[in-house]
């Protein structure tokens, strides 16, 4: 497959601008009301605190910023969601170039992601999942740079974006655990602890202190809410439901990913490449892509 590499940047930026306009405009013209999660974030934003009963505060904070600028114009919150998404695409584009040293692969990485249901159809709803996306990609990006360049600035940025991601959604912790396991693997492999990694850890903890204080003062309400939701089906009398529902969920996810797999197969088949299982870059990708799923 041949691309004009000089124009790949233009192609990428055209792609994300089209995505931004399309997925901001379509719901603005067709929806009578904002999605429930977006309304909830706006309600929380009107009374900002360091946490809320369901989630940590970041999504409410970002929604409130847009409310202060755009007021109650619905289109603004569809735009907010798409800004978060296309910025995530931009970071993925940058990370792919860092890893593969090839802008074409960076662009194709984003195109393949566009084929996933959760990166197109569901994105107009600004919620905690959209809120964490740019910080998920930024955390991965700076974890990569911190490991391979060992620059104090990169470690600091890793700590900052890890904290904001965690303050968007607690499930962000699965990514943080995966990155931590990767660093442990590297330290063991090199037989040397990297003290610069403490920069990220210290910044992460300091940034979380206000939220942790709020959490204690409010009887850990965000955590108990999540545990209650997870525990709500354990007392069901029909045990077969504990098999049927997970299988149903799995089949739905497989169905949703069909366009992704088709695109992946069509694109990958055009390139010749060889996997090096000992390559640290490849191992990094395994840790940050698959370990969070396994941990969940």
What are these regions (language model features)?
Residues 47, 154-170, 204-208:
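Membrane-interface alpha helices of multi-pass inner-membrane proteins
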Residues 26-41, 51-65, 71-76, 219:
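Extracytoplasmic catalytic/substrate-binding loops of multi-pass membrane glycan-assembly enzymes
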Residues 63-67, 80-91, 112, 132-135, ...:
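Transmembrane alpha-helices of multi-pass, membrane-embedded glycan-processing enzymes
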Residues 175-278:
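Transmembrane-lumen/periplasm boundary regions of multi-pass, lipid-linked membrane glycan transferases
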Residues 121-131:
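Short acidic/glycine- and proline-prone juxtamembrane loop motifs at membrane-interface regions
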Residues 9, 79-100, 115, 137-142:
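Transmembrane-helix motifs of polytopic, lipid-linked glycan transferases
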Residues 16, 106-114, 162, 166:
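Short helix- or helix-capping micro-motifs
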Residues 97-100, 139-154, 165:
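Membrane-interface transmembrane helices that cradle and orient dolichyl/undecaprenyl
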């Amino acid at each position: 497959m041949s691309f004009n590499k000089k124009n790949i940047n233009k192609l990428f930026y055209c792609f994300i601008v089209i995505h931004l306009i399309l997925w901001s405009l379509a719901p603005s013209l067709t929806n009578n009301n904002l999605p429930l999660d977006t309304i909830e974030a706006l309600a929380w934003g009107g009374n900002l605190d360091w946490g809320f009963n369901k989630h940590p505060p970041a999504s409410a904070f970002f929604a409130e910023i847009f409310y202060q600028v755009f007021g109650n114009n619905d289109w603004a919150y569809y735009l907010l969601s798409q800004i978060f998404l296309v910025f995530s695409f931009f970071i993925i584009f940058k990370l792919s170039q860092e890893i593969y040293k090839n802008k074409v692969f960076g662009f194709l990485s984003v195109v393949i992601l566009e084929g996933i249901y959760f990166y197109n159809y569901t994105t107009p709803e600004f919620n905690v999942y959209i809120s964490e996306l740019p910080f998920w990609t930024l955390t991965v990006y700076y974890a990569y740079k911190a490991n391979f360049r060992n620059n104090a600035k990169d470690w600091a940025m890793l700590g900052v974006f890890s904290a904001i991601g965690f303050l968007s959604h607690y499930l962000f912790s699965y990514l943080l655990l995966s990155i931590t396991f990767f660093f442990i693997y590297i330290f063991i492999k090199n037989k040397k602890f990297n003290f610069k990694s403490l920069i990220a850890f210290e910044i992460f903890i300091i940034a979380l202190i206000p939220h942790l204080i709020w959490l204690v003062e409010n009887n850990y309400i965000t955590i108990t809410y999540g545990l209650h939701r997870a525990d709500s089906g354990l007392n069901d009398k029909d045990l077969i439901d504990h098999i049927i529902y997970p299988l149903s969920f799995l089949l739905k996810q497989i169905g949703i990913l069909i366009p992704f797999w088709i695109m992946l197969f069509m694109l990958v088949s055009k390139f010749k490449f060889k996997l090096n299982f000992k390559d640290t870059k490849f191992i990094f990708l395994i840790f940050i892509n698959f370990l969070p799923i396994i941990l969940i």
